[in-house]
Amino acid sequence: MSDNEIKNEAPKKLSLQRRTKTTVADGKVQVEVRKSRKIDTAAVKKAQEEAALKAKQEAEAKAQAEKTAAEQAKAEAEAAKKAEGAKVEATKKSAPAVPVMPNSKPKAAAPKAEQPKQEKALDPEKEAKKKEEAELRRKQEELARQKAEMEAKRAAENARRLAEIAREEAAENGEEFEDDRFTSSYAREADRDNDRRSEANRGRGKGGVNKAKKGDREDKNERNADRRNQKDVKGKGKNAKKGSALQQAFTKPVQVNKADVVIGETITVAELANKMAVKATEIIKTMMKMGEMVTINQVIDQETAQLVAEEMGHKVILRNENELEDAVMEDRDVDAEKVTRAPVVTIMGHVDHGKTSLLDYIRKAKVAAGEAGGITQHIGAYHVETEDGKMITFLDTPGHAAFTSMRARGAKATDIVVLVVAADDGVMPQTIEAIQHARAAGAPIVVAVNKIDKPEANPDRVEQELLQHEVVSEKFGGDVQFVSVSAKKGLGIDDLLEAILLQSEVLELTAVKEGMASGVVIESYLDKGRGPVATILVQSGTLNKGDIVLCGFEYGRVRAMRDENGKEVDSAGPSIPVEVLGLSGVPAAGDEATVVRDEKKAREVALFRQGKFREVKLARQQKAKLENMFSNMTAGDVAELNVIVKADVQGSVEAICQSLAELSTDEVKVKVVGSGVGGITETDATLAAASNAIMVGFNVRADASARRVIEAENIDLRYYSIIYELLNEIKAAMSGMLQPEFKQEIIGLAEVRDVFRHPKFGAIAGCMVTEGVVKRNNPIRVLRDNVVIFEGELESLRRFKDDVSEVRNGMECGIGVKNYNDVKVGDQIEVFEVVEVKRSI
């Protein structure tokens, strides 16, 4: 073979367009990630040979069967022909013999030559039958041949498919001899050139140029085989894309991989679409088919989202949003043995019925004197020991109507409710409310009938009135203990304590003493020097100094603990109230306080709760916007009184804000633009100036910087220590913002006795004043048969010939009505004035 032929057979360099998917016009080279595989060609070849041999054997068997069938048909045709010939021969023999003359031999030969023609003429039906049999044989042979060809084609196709499957299995099971490589098309081409040159050099060393040429031919044959394999995999046809030797043949996935969808308790349509990797419109269409009309930002519940995701072919994983919180709560040591604990007693009743005075006598401390006006402003938590060494914890709740939520919290945290009712006052509204709170909390009631030392005291009346509210005393066959006491003189106090302890024994109160503590926040406030302070009632376990406490939205390490007397303590067991310092913020009263192990996890739970509360708040605001869309159209007609509330404790802030919200009317609305616990700061004053608000301080004062802003901006700042005064003054301020109300008052009535005509004034009515006073400048009405026929004003009022300003009852006068001349005898002229009536809330 010449050098030119070798050169022609050498592998030609492919164009850059076929080897890569980009050009070098912009200086970029596409980088491909490939894996080289070593394919066992011997196994592929062996599989192909076996498949071809099998197809050949099947074709031969089919051909042999067809040949046998054809021979059998031919034999049957010959047998039929012989039978027909025998029949003809028998016919000949049975015919009469014709005498043959010796000298007539040529004539005898003629009939022998014409014999076949005579036979054909004699039996044309048999000839037609033979033709039909021959045609039938031909058709059978043609059909058998076509069937054999089809079977051969099918066998060849099966053999080709088996060969492809064997080749793919061999390729998959082949050993990988190279790791992933990151290389360009130029680098791969250069590597191949180097390999060919090195092979050529080795060939020249042993055997000359021929071995190098042989190696090039083998390389070319291998590449051609690879191309053919790629063509077989990708399919045949004119439009089939040719596989490139430099491009990895990746098969596209037949079906889109649908990821699992994690769904929380609530999710918006947009978030669900994002997790499912589909357009939000697809979800909206699916929900429309399910009968639900939603928007892209609408929040849907977990069950609906699960149905939609499963309908669209996704697997759903339901997630509880409180998983982190549950995990933190489960990692607590609460398996200790339970022991008997002290009862928690809440003292409830109507305002000024003597609750704090009763507790004051029990504690032997003057607390009521410290309360402004003798009214308890927030919950007080105390624990006392009886003479026999047993302990009782008391919660003193406010009795004023504004402190409903605080009474509800007190009842929730309590074991026994002591209902204080004044013997001289009886059952009052807050008494009934206290009964309802006690029943809602499931706490038994002990009734303390107070002020029995007064002369007008009537304990039997109290029992009768409570009987109407299903509080039945033991005297009437019920289970409620009634104890008559006097907080002022100390009468019956021991009997009350004994009744409380007896009730606690019936309840069999127990709690875990050792282990991680849990409790409830009774009250909280912000102390200027100490920071956030929370009064926590421990319900189980022991709260120690240094514990990590998770409290609603807040968390922190207990830096210090104090009892109700301000004394430092290091630990507090069940039923003991303590003040806790060290929280990250002021928790809401009523929040559950729990000791956890990890401060980092406690912070995560607190932040999660804050975010969840923020979402709920925003959703509620959005709902309120939609619901109040039409009412906001007339918002310009409603006057607003902006108020900033600062109080000493969280419970007072809640009570004041709730009471102010209840004062709002259709015309004047109270808007609390700011509220908080602690003293009034410069920030509060700046907010009041910007929002034109009234500042209300409840048991707090403004600091020096705040006072400077208040004086400069002329802000209305008011201090209160009793909630009655606060609400009354806010009502007065709201009353001043009401639109005035006008009322018409009749001041005089005159009866027309005669009518005179005057050229200048027209009709003049001579009248007698029958009621009140007729005034010249006031508006009038003309009545006929007690029906108003004209409303206007007087043009003239004369007594005799003198003009007068007014005419009193029982006197005669002449009245000229302006722009009205149809006055008749018997009409009545009614004089009235418009009076502005002061409105109040």
From Swiss-Prot:
Keywords: Cytoplasm, GTP-binding, Initiation factor, Nucleotide-binding, Protein biosynthesis
Basic and acidic residues composition-biased segments: 1-12, 50-92, 114-170, 188-202, 213-235
GO molecular function: GTP binding; GTPase activity; guanosine tetraphosphate binding; translation initiation factor activity
Stretch list, region G2: 374-378
Compartments reported by the entry: Cytoplasm
SUPFAM superfamilies: Initiation factor IF2/eIF5b, domain 3, P-loop containing nucleoside triphosphate hydrolases, Translation proteins
Region (G4) location: 450-453
Region (Disordered): 1-24, 50-246
Family annotation (Pfam families): EF-G_D2 (PF22042), GTP_EFTU (PF00009), GTP_EFTU_D2 (PF03144), IF-2 (PF11987), IF2_N (PF04760)
Region (G1): 349-356
Residues binding GTP, per UniProt: 349-356, 396-400, 450-453
UniProt-listed PROSITE patterns: G_TR_2, IF2
Region (G3): 396-399
Region G5, residue ranges: 486-488
GO CC terms of this entry: cytosol
Family to which the UniProt record says this protein belongs: Belongs to the TRAFAC class translation factor GTPase superfamily. Classic translation factor GTPase family. IF-2 subfamily.
Function: One of the essential components for the initiation of protein synthesis. Protects formylmethionyl-tRNA from spontaneous hydrolysis and promotes its binding to the 30S ribosomal subunits. Also involved in the hydrolysis of GTP during the formation of the 70S ribosomal complex.
Designated name of the protein: Translation initiation factor IF-2
